[in-house]
């Protein structure tokens, strides 16, 4: 988030300059992705995204349009993502309680009177609006039961309003897009706009495109706030001009920013909480100029009020984070980006002498929580003294305090930050290790179903304990004994402690599994190629169990994993062992597939299209978790998007529709970029939440297995540069992209409903879908998409047949699904 209400204030005062985009010809432009995406996806765009899930397709359209103009003017964009969150940001996002407070507010509040809009966090606003959307839709369904037969009811209440879309949710999709199209990107250790400032100061880039927070950095003179591509112009802010017009010092400006709320301190502090958000900065500035208000001093003077201690700490942490923010430097290390301060030459020499006497800064002299008010006064008085005495001034970095971990976070190894910077890991597990909390936040469908909560509980043994052990084992022993808890939004006061220490460690149980092929240098990793490699072995134990581990430094380079294919294949096999798709025993020299693994290894033999292999694995793992049968109603029951007329008149066919829509949540419709506004279905979305949860956990477990291999030294890490890591490894990682939306599932749902009520007339049913989903613009090849999705159902039917033969699913479910697919075949071919 940017400094609250500052941008509109600057526009009103005419402090935002404009210039022809030609001025950026041949320059390297660093772009803050979070700020950039917030400008592309404004409040009126993608308002129903939370009701269908998936990647916002309109974002790709805007992105492609902008990149074309960048290319026309030979501008080299570098996209920088946010990394970890500081303590203030974690608290504001509800990290430590898994957004349980926000979820409870949204579940009990349906009007804007629930909390003050000024004090409400973005998370609260998102969940509140989502709850309003579903409440209004449920009411529409109930009130239209008598008239609703076969034409779906369109939602009226948007699911997103006055909230920003967090780009981190789509980070992996954006990174995949940038890699595919050859654009540079980076994930910052923490704040992206600080990383931009570092790169600008180091002369690696020519300009930055970032939020108004950049005004708090005195090392950034100018920055681009926005692009007006239709007019071939860009909007920029000149810091010196802004400060001159505001009539306040830089320190006073920071004081105002910390009070109204900004990226480093998101909470609006007293006494500003009573004012409307659009007027916050204007009112705060007026208070400073007219009455000499110092907002930090105000917090200190109201210690008897509720939350006063918390407000003081929030302010102090915000100031401290501004002064000491970690960035990824050109050395490859993550170090603090410490801004310089102006001192007299005499004081500088005195401090240097004192520094030699004591190697450690005392908490009292270098504490990050030192009074900002005192600092402001001191700086001002020192400045006057220097001017009067004409003492020579010098710039020197601030002393680094010894409590940075209290307001930023604990330090992880530099190698971990490197893997995060290239998008190899999403970073959620890293955040859990740093904070001691892995939050399970409410999914799009609310997560109220018993089966979803059961899935969350089961994930501890299936995924989380293994992931935490794999990631903490290679690093400082402190993290191996540090308590890390899974905190669930529906039971925040009953956290589950994850297991850090195991004997033997998780890595020791799998590090003898090695996949090496002779032609691996030419291969690109895919699940299909992996299956071919495994099935090509006549003796899995002999071919894939190594007598000796390959991670010690004494092992020659040529004996290690030297190709991306071998690296990813080795760790994918280890993943399948941890998921119990394979049985592995090093002492017994045993490696063989379980019944689940046998079905998986038949995917090529069954001629399952390789692009569906990942979806099939997600489906298999979901069935293996056994939390919800494919034909089972969720509890408590969710309202169906089918009409009561359909449910009463066609009970058997309605069950077919249920199975079909659930499976099709794994299928992504090929649609053109558009802002979706069409039918929604909470029952289908809830099932999608289950599969999305499985996919996210599969991704994190594979990340943990891969990181454990890399940090141990099994792979020749120097064989790739940054671009090589992106193109040859990150690009081919499985389970990275966001789960499909529910559009194709709903298209089939309402197609079949119309088909049943309209005398089995296929064309009328397709016309209904085209009209209701506005496919003339978004999906012009509607017939092809129905054929392709039907082919996907036939592929899943083959897998179900194998599962039934292996007695891994209930035979009644298999028969029911077979009939459901036959029903779709009849409807589509009529």
Curated annotation (Swiss-Prot):
It comes from the Eukaryota. Residues 347-400 are annotated as: Disordered. Gene3D superfamilies: 5'-nuclease. The modification Phosphoserine is found at residues 358, 362, 371. The keyword Phosphoprotein applies. Residues 380-400 have a biased composition (Basic and acidic residues). Its main location: cytoplasm. GO terms for molecular function: DNA endonuclease activity; mRNA 3'-UTR binding. Residues 361-373 have a biased composition (Low complexity). GO terms for biological process: DNA damage response; positive regulation of translation; regulation of mating type switching; regulation of translation. Changing residue 453 to R: In strain: ATCC 24657 / D273-10B, ATCC 200060 / W303, Sigma 1278B, YJM 1129, YJM 270, YJM 627 and YJM 789. There is a cross-link at residue 4 (Glycyl lysine isopeptide (Lys-Gly) (interchain with G-Cter in ubiquitin)). InterPro entries: MKT1_C, MKT1_H3TH, MKT1_N, PIN-like_dom_sf, XPG-I_dom, XPG/Rad2, XPG_DNA_repair_N. Present with 3430 molecules/cell in log phase SD medium. This is Post-transcriptional regulator MKT1. It comes from Saccharomyces cerevisiae (strain ATCC 204508 / S288c).
